[in-house]
Amino acid sequence: IDFEEIKKDMILLASNYAEGYVRVIISRSTSKSDYDVYIFHQEPVEIPEHYSLQSQPSPWHPGGDFALEDNQVVGTKSTSYALNIAQTRIAEQNGYSDALLLNRENIVLEGPTFSIGWIKGDTVYVPDLQLGILDSITRQYILLFGSNNQIKVKESRISIDEIYDVDTVFVISTAKHAKFVSKIDSKTYNQSPILELIQDCFTKQIEIEKLNEFK
């Protein structure tokens, strides 16, 4: 796969739009040399000002750790986002912005399309990868900010009951650079000043990468 060529095509496509996202899908068949690349523009995602999450069990998730009798989708290998979307829609029907996925032990995993983080005291936490969560780019940036001593970061695990007691919760994705979560289930949160620091770290990182790319 010629990633440099894909990168050039992405930049060319992005130059036609003032805002939005450029998405890339690479599909491969049984042969390593046989693949297709799809590059497309997506309009900016509208994110509600007050962002709320409903906790939901996720037996289909790689980190769900549910038994076969718990749900018929356990053990199903799928590249479909249908199950993610279904949990988002359930949350929306119940008056929430999105879903917060839990495993069998009620440990917080991630969202259907985003990673999760939380703040307690002066420390920022993200779930560890052994839970089967996605090692997302934005999650990697949180760890990078920690290694650069911009913020204090730890990988950890937290139950849904424990996350009710933290100071601040936020979500991270391509469209959500540390978006404040105002409510999980019936628990409401206040925004820690550290969250603004995280958001500032993302803004500066993007500017650095833009400068490096277009030198």
Q: How would you describe each model-predicted region?
A:
Residues 1-12, 32-215:
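Helix-start/capping segments and mature chain N-termini
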Residues 4-28:
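Short, acidic/charged, Gly/Pro-enriched secondary-structure junctions
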